[in-house]
Amino acid sequence: MNNKTEKKGQRIASDHISELAEGEVFVFGSNIQGAHGGGAAWYAYKNFGAEWGVGEGLTGRTYALPTMEGAASLQKAVERFTDCAAQHPELTFLVTAVGCGIAGYTPAQVAPLFKNAAALKNVYLPQCFVELL
């Protein structure tokens, strides 16, 4: 299992995460109600302990990031995620292409929100975000 790579100082999360190593956290897009009914949210719920009804934050071996409540809300949620990742250097956060599925955003819209998170050594972003930063 290799869920992450480093190339030229860039930390890249795998596009296909089926299991997690010790200390790895699966970061997925959610809705604020925590109804994890589809996409990566459903996968996180079924496989990594995301709690139904929790729409933001650490649960199980996951971090729920609400993406369905609008761009301004998403920006604030990413800021809170970045703060959480900074407070937990013992964890490795593997970010999926949050917001780019059911929520309907493009990587070009979401990637810039992760600029500060990308500077953290324990945050790995999807290739489609890294290419835009």
Residue map of PLM features:
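Macrodomain-like recognition of ADP-ribose-binding/processing modules
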Residues: M1-L133
